[in-house]
Structure formats: C-alpha cells, structure tokens
C-alpha cells in the first residue's frame, strides 16, 4: 500500500529558511552501542589476523544467490572498498570511508554503486561474528585489502579506526542536479574546474562517466575530467594512473543487456520485502553472466583474478576503437579483434568473453602526461606495484587524519606527508607555574585581548572534523600558506607571531632544565589568557582549561598545496566573507560550524563571545554591539534583542545592515547577515534569548569558555 499523502513540515512551508539540521548531527547520540562506547579500544582487542583469514576464505566461497565472477569475489570487494573511500574530496574533507557511509543513503543507492549492496551482504557473516570490534567502515576497507592480497598483490598496509555512523551525513553537498548520472552547468566553473566543494563530475558517480563526458567517447574531455576529479581527491597524475591501472587489472564490468530495460529500483526505493537490496535484474538469471551493473560489458584482460601487467600491456600495445556493447553503452574494442573471445567466462571457464577498455582507460593512453606514466610503469613493473600500493593506501586512509588515529598491527612505520606529520615533543612540557608566568607575560605584551584571541582562533579554527585535518597543533599558522591567507590578516598576523616568537625564545633560552614551550601551545595559551582577563573585566572568575603538548611542524612536514584546500572562503565567527564565496554568509557559517563539530548552541555562544571580545576581520565594527569590546559580556545578544532598535539594509547587496534607534533614527551599530541571523532565525533566536537574559550572563561566559576549550583541542588526538 502506498501513502500518497504528504504531511507538510517546517521546511516545506518555508523552504528558504536556513537549515540547521547539519548541526543537529553533532548533538544527537545515535550510536546503538551508547555514548560511552570506545571503538578504538574495541578494535585493539580484535584478532585482525583471524578476520583476514575469514575474509580470504570467503573470497572463493561462491554463493548461489550472488555467484563470484571467475570463482573469486576479490574484484567485487576492491570495487566496494574503492567506492567507499573514493567519495572523499579535498575541498571540505567530506566523504570517504569513515563512518561506513556506503551502507547509508544516498551513497548506498548511487548508480555507481549498483550491486555493491550484494557485496556488503556477503560480508555480513563476518561483521556478525566480530560485532562491535569491527566497524563496517573498517571491514569494507579491509575486505578490499585482503582481496588484493588474495590475488597476488602486496599491499602497503592497513589501519583501523573508522567508527561507524548510523545516520546519513546530511552536511555533504553532492551537487546541484536532481537526477542521477547528470551533469549541470552549475557543477563546473567557466574554466572547467569543479565548483567548491564538489569532487565528482557527475551526480551519483564516484569520479567521472566511464563512457566519457555526457556519455560520449571523448578521450580528451575524459582525461580532463579524470585529472580534475582525481585532483580534487588529492591524487597527482602518477597516483591517478596507478590507481586506475591497478584497480582495472582485476575483474570486469557488467552490462549483459540494457540497464534501463531490465534493472529495478535502487535500495532506497526498493519494496520493503527486498530488505534493502536493490537493482533487481530481470535479464536472464539476473546474476553471473547475466549481471547488469554499469551497462558496460567485459574484462580488461585475460587474467582478471591475478596481479600482473596485462592491463597496462593491453592498453598500450593494442589500438582501440569505440563500439556500443550489449548493454548499449560506449566501450572500446581492439581494432584488430585480437582480444575478442580471449578471456574466460565468469562462471564457465570454457566460455569466452571479449577484452574491452573504457573510455576512461583509453583516455590515459591518449593524454601525453598520463601515457608517459603508463609507459614508465610498463618498463618498470616494480615501480607500478609500489606506486599502486602507496596510492591505494592513500586512497583508503585519506580521510582518517594524522597517524595517531591509525590502529592495528599493519600500520606502516612511515608517516606520509598527506598525514600532516608533527614532530615529537623531545622536551618536558610546561607545568602550572610556567603556564601562569607565560600567561602574565602574554597579557603584558603589546598584543591586545582581541589580537590574542584572534590569533588563537585563526590557528585552531582550520580544523575539519570531516577528515581530521587542520587545528592548532603544529602552529602551521606561522607557515605558508596559512600565514598569507587574507582571512588571517597577514600584516597583523606577522606582528603577532613576532611577539609570540620573542616570548617563546625568551622563555626557552632562560630555562636551565629540559622544559620548553612550543609556539603552538603558546598561541592557544595567549587566547586562553585573554579570555580569562576579559571575563575578569566583566566580573567573572574563570579558568580556561589548557593541556600542553602541541608541537611545531616544520615546512618540510607541510604540503603547501594540500593545506591550501583548508583556506576558508568565509569565517562568520570573525565576520569574514571572501570575494570568492558563492553562498550566503550565514550558510557558510553553519557549514564551518559543522566542520568544527559544533552544535547550534555552540555556534551561537561562540559568535556572541567573539563579537564581545572584538574579534572581527580587519578590526571591523560589524557585529561589535558593545561599548566595551574586549570584555566578555553578553552585550551582543542584549543589543540584538533590544526592541528599542530596528535594522535596515545599508547596501544594495544586503550584506551590511544598520541598527537604528527607533525614536531618533540614529545609527547605533552595524552588523552583517551573520550577526542578524541570531535574531531572525527562530531556533537561533531562542538560544540567543537564553544568553541575552540578565540572569544568565554567567551561563553565557561559562558556555563560551567550555566551547572555546573544545575548539582549541579538536586536533589533540594524543589526549584520547
């Protein structure tokens, strides 16, 4: 029975209202294991070798309900792991294998993930056996690694630590299209580059259309899209070729007939009795040689369950021409026909299949730079093996953050540059007495309270909980590219850093013992000291928690190009809006708050507190609704909620507003869209009314201190 009625909710009546639901993800407890469950601890108790034995045995245990191609599930699990990790994009760090989100909508129902629902069902007995010790996120990736190893490939390593999600990540912007496998003009900039924050070129596909742009066998356009999409996943040309060539050494694509005529609804739209399985195939037996996935049909070589050089050799040594396959999709066949009927059948090895290539494969050969990499690999098979192993390791771990979060006995000793390495603290950390002395010196320096707070915020607020990058640890704010970002006011930052470095040098040089202070710790300590002073000036005695132990990264440990992806287009907490911001500033504020793992309450108290402290970009007066900036009061909220005033737009673009006295018409204050958000949005106004109450200023101060402290240690994985 279908229910055609629709109960209208708030978002239906007012679809243009700012959506705060992505912040609710940070406040809700939806883990069935409970909020005290420590997955890292559970994983450390896992017998990883036993799990791998179970996985390897399963690889060749073909099931009648979904038989293994060539008697081996390995290629299916490689695709599953790749498509889990491959959703990662550098712009905002979202996507990736963490959370096991491939089993949740919308990714579970993407057209690029057809029949991966069966792969996960094949894994269920193993997940069932190990339970909480092994997350879906880790199992999906581990299955891909074991698949490679079971077919003769030597992987570089494996790290566990991916705690599962149990709800979809609504914060991810997958693109503007409302139909699968489409590409609108709004996905790309005029120069053909993907718009922020997108990483895939087609809605519902991991990277690019395997038939070519817009389903046409355009080699040049395909290579351009590959470079753009893989680049947004932080892969260079060599890594890109290694991944594609390595992955396509195994298995086949499936297009026994036309998908549109034979394949049913995706899992999210399938009938209830299908129990989450989608894409029911009515062609033939619907499985085995009759399987339909992408609509493209055939293997890349004659040894689809064995690691060798045959993919690279076939691609380079034969001439290829486009044709429509049995599924009606564009694919490529050898001009000579030499590889026709040369590969074994998926179920009966006495049957034969044609070897084929995708448009995206032939594009690698056609593009001069990609071809050069292919030829290098052909001449040096060992280099190909090593390049694929490291690129694969990067692919499946890119969203896990620094090496401190990598768990298990197969974690490599080497730390990669993409893990944003940090030096160890080879000195004694500052004690309480030293902390007190340093705070006094910082407050007595030429740096004002707003400058101290602003510098600490600029350092810590680069953190992204999506891929665990950024943050105050490392003091990379003193290195390129961060020290030159417009949002950080380079000239003012330069002066502040000089003061910090002088205080650090004076302290460290004066010590006769092994105690030292890092610049990373000192910057955070400066912000803490300023907040304590600002609270005292408002009549409140607070102690801002401080945990020393941050170290200072070197330029050699910092990939400038990689860190450029962390550059904010806007920071509503500092009332900064960059020229290249393509969304409303209030939307970008919520997006940044979500990346900082903040709730709506956290976001509100932080904005109010930072405004009271005078922390704005360029020392702007926007949002400074107080006569005593630098004092931790709730003036931002009391002024915003005062009905003796009214707001008027002061610019045609409605980015700046004036607060006028209702009686005199005099302009008292100016504010941005971000500032006005806390009075206009009903949810945020409700929170603002709490912090704007006369009886609750102390609550505001304490909540600000608590939230500030959480932001300052978001990247302190060493404390977990």
Swiss-Prot record:
Catalytic activity, reaction form: H2O2 + AH2 = A + 2 H2O; 2 H2O2 = O2 + 2 H2O
Residues reported in the UniProt entry to bind heme b: 248
CC cofactor note: Binds 1 heme b (iron(II)-protoporphyrin IX) group per dimer.
PTM description: Formation of the three residue Trp-Tyr-Met cross-link is important for the catalase, but not the peroxidase activity of the enzyme.
InterPro entries: Catalase_peroxidase, Haem_peroxidase, Haem_peroxidase_sf, Peroxidases_AS, Peroxidases_heam-ligand_BS
Site (Transition state stabilizer): 79
One Pfam match: peroxidase
GO cellular component, one term: cytosol
Key words of the record: Heme, Hydrogen peroxide, Iron, Metal-binding, Oxidoreductase, Peroxidase, Plasmid
GO molecular function per UniProt: catalase activity; heme binding; metal ion binding
Cofactor(s) it depends on: heme b
Position of the Tryptophyl-tyrosyl-methioninium (Trp-Tyr) (with M-233) cross-link: 82-207
Residues at the active site: 83
EC number: 1.11.1.21
Residue ranges crossing the lipid bilayer per the database entry: none
NCBIfam families listed in its UniProt record: cat_per_HPI, PRK15061.1
Binding partners and assembly: Homodimer or homotetramer.
PANTHER family cross-referenced by the UniProt entry: CATALASE-PEROXIDASE, HYDROPEROXIDASE I, BIFUNCTIONAL CATALASE-PEROXIDASE
Protein family: Belongs to the peroxidase family. Peroxidase/catalase subfamily.
Descriptive protein name: Catalase-peroxidase
Organism: Halobacterium salinarum (strain ATCC 700922 / JCM 11081 / NRC-1)
Gene it is expressed from: katG
């Amino acid at each position: 029975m279908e229910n055609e009625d629709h109960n209208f909710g708030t978002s239906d009546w007012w679809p243009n209202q700012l959506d705060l639901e992505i912040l609710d993800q940070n406040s809700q407890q939806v883990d069935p294991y409970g909020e005290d469950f420590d997955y890292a601890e559970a994983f450390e108790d896992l017998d990883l070798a036993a799990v791998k034995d179970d996985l390897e045995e399963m690889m060749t245990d073909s099931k009648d309900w979904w038989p293994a191609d060539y008697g081996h599930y390995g290629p299916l699990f490689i695709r599953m792991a790749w498509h889990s990790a491959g959703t990662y994009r550098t712009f905002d760090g979202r996507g990736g294998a963490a959370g096991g989100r491939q089993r949740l909508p919308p990714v579970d129902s993407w057209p690029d993930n057809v029949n991966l629902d069966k792969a996960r069902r094949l894994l269920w007995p193993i997940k069932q056996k190990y339970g909480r010790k092994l997350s879906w996120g880790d199992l999906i990736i581990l299955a891909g690694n074991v698949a490679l190893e079971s077919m003769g490939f030597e992987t570089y390593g494996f790290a566990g630590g991916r705690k599962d999600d149990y709800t979809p990540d609504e914060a991810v912007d997958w693109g503007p299209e409302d139909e699968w496998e489409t590409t609108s003009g709004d996905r790309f900039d005029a120069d053909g580059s993907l718009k922020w924050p997108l990483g895939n070129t087609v809605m519902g596909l991991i990277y690019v259309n395997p038939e070519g742009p817009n389903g046409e066998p355009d080699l040049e356009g395909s290579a351009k899209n590959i470079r753009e999409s893989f680049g947004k996943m932080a892969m260079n040309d060599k890594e890109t070729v290694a991944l594609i060539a390595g992955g396509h050494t195994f298995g086949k694509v499936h297009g026994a007939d036309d998908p549109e005529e034979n394949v049913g609804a995706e899992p999210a739209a399938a009938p209830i009795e299908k129990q989450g399985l989608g894409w029911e195939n009515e062609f033939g037996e619907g499985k085995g040689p009759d399987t339909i996935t992408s609509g493209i049909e055939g293997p890349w070589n004659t040894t689809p369950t064995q690691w060798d050089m045959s993919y690279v050799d076939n691609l380079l040594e034969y001439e290829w021409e486009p044709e429509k396959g049995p599924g009606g999709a564009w694919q490529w066949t050898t001009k000579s026909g030499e590889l026709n009927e040369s590969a074994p059948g998926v179920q009966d090895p006495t049957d034969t299949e044609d070897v084929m290539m995708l448009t995206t494969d032939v594009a690698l050969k056609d593009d001069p730079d990609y071809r050069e990499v292919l030829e290098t690999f052909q001449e040096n098979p060992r280099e190909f093996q090593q390049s694929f192993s490291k690129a694969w390791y990067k692919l499946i771990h890119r969203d896990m953050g620094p090496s401190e979060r990598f768990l298990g006995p197969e974690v490599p000793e080497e730390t990669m540059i993409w893990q944003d390495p940090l030096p160890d603290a080879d000195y004694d950390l500052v004690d309480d007495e030293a902390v007190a002395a340093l705070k006094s010196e910082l407050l007595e320096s030429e740096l004002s309270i707003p400058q101290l707070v602003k510098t600490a915020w600029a350092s810590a607020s680069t953190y992204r909980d999506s891929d665990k990058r950024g943050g105050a640890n490392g003091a990379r704010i003193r290195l390129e590219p961060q020290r030159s970002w417009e949002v950080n006011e380079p000239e003012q930052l330069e002066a502040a850093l000089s003061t910090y470095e002088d205080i650090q040098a004076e302290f460290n040089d004066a010590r006769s013992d092994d105690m030292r202070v890092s610049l990373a710790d000192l910057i955070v300590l400066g912000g803490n000291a300023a907040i304590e002073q600002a609270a005292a000036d408002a009549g409140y005695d607070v102690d801002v928690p401080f945990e020393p132990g941050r170290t200072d990264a070197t330029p050699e440990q910092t990939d400038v190009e990689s860190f450029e992806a962390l550059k904010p287009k806007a920071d509503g907490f500092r009332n900064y809006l960059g020229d290249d911001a393509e969304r409303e500033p209030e939307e970008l504020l919520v997006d940044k708050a979500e990346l900082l793992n903040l709730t709506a309450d956290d976001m509100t108290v932080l904005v109010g507190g930072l405004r009271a402290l005078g922390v704005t970009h360029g020392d702007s007066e926007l949002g400074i609704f107080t006569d005593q900036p630098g004092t931790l009061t709730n003036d931002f909220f009391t002024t915003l909620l005062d009905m003796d005033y009214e707001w008027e737009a002061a610019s045609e673009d409605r980015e700046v507003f004036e607060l006028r006295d209702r009686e005199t018409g005099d302009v008292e204050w100016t504010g941005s869209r971000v500032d006005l958000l806390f009075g206009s949005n009903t949810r945020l106004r409700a929170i603002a009314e709490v912090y704007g109450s006369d009886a609750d200023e102390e609550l505001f101060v304490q909540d600000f201190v608590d939230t500030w402290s959480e932001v300052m240690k978001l990247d302190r994985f060493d404390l977990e």
